[in-house]
């Protein structure tokens, strides 16, 4: 692998507010070019084994949304560790309570339907910056905790159905879904769900099959397999944009101190908005 991706790339802390409609910075590719994505009207799926760097990417995404006053944060983290650092500025924070998770998804579905009623009345196709609606970013880490571990079978299935609905219908209503899993298996991320994500990012996986479950069938045989990423290369993964080919990149790293500073910065921005 090329040397530029092996060197750690600490991320700086922004000094001004952003917008969720602007591209967000994720890191650099093998040619040291900036990698940015536009998540408004899109969703992203992140997958990889424990310690592969999903949380590195996740924090970059949440950081951009946090300092965007035009975006609300709804965070779900069964372990309450990774996303817990951001909970002070989240409109909704769900820990290890499946009932709370289901009620939050119900509320978000109701908000989505209300926005579609507004759009139908206004004869419009999607929410824009001119509307009185802020974007909402729903971040779920880890999907398998809520869809395959906690609660009973009926609750887990209900969670999976509601999440799929938000991924499928939320984009035009200004609802962005960011989902992460360390269990990239077909029962956790079925093809019907994976294909709804406009962006997919695969970090180190144990097998080609696991890599393809995130990126899509056939990419491993085409030479884009996350199981070839070295275990020590945390934060390196393949990013696939809708209609493109996977791009090998390294995510910028935010320390805990960066995150604490960003939370305070975001608090000031949101207070002034």
Predicted regions and their residues:
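Acidic-aromatic/histidine active-site loop/patch
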Residues: 1
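P-loop NTPase catalytic phosphate-binding loop
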Residues: 4-122, 136-223, 227-229, 252-260, ...
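Short polybasic amphipathic segments
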Residues: 24-26, 235-241
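Glycine-centered tight beta-turn/hairpin loop motif at sheet-sheet or coil-to-beta transitions
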Residues: 32, 242-244
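Short proline/glycine-enriched turn/loop segments at secondary-structure junctions
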Residues: 126-128, 225-229, 239
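Short basic/glycine-enriched coil/helix segment immediately N-terminal to the Walker B
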Residues: 127-136
């Amino acid at each position: 692998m090329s040397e530029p991706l092996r060197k750690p790339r600490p991320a700086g802390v922004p000094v001004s507010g952003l917008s969720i409609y602007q591209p967000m910075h994720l890191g650099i590719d093998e040619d040291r070019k900036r990698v940015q994505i536009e998540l408004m009207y899109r969703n992203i799926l992140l997958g990889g084994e424990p310690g592969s760097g999903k949380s590195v990417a996740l924090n970059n995404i949440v950081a951009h949304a946090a300092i965007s006053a035009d975006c609300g944060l709804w965070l779900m983290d069964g372990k309450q560790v990774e996303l817990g650092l951001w909970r002070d500025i989240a409109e909704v924070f769900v820990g290890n309570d499946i009932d709370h998770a289901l009620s939050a998804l119900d509320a978000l579905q109701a908000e989505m339907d209300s926005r579609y009623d507004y759009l139908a009345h206004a004869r419009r196709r999607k929410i824009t910056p001119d509307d009185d609606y802020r974007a909402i970013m729903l971040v779920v880490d880890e999907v398998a905790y809520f869809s395959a571990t906690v609660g009973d079978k009926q609750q887990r299935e209900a969670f999976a159905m509601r999440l799929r609905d938000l991924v499928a219908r939320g984009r035009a209503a200004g609802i962005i879904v960011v989902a992460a899993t360390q269990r990239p298996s077909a029962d956790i991320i079925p093809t019907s769900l994976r294909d709804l994500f406009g962006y997919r990012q695969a970090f180190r996986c144990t097998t080609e099959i696991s890599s393809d479950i995130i990126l899509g069938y056939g990419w491993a045989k085409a030479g884009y397999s996350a199981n070839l990423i070295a275990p020590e290369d945390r934060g390196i993964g393949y990013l696939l944009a809708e209609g493109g080919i996977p791009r090998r990149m390294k995510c910028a790293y935010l320390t805990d101190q960066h995150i604490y500073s960003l939370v305070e910065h975001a608090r000031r921005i949101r207070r002034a908005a």
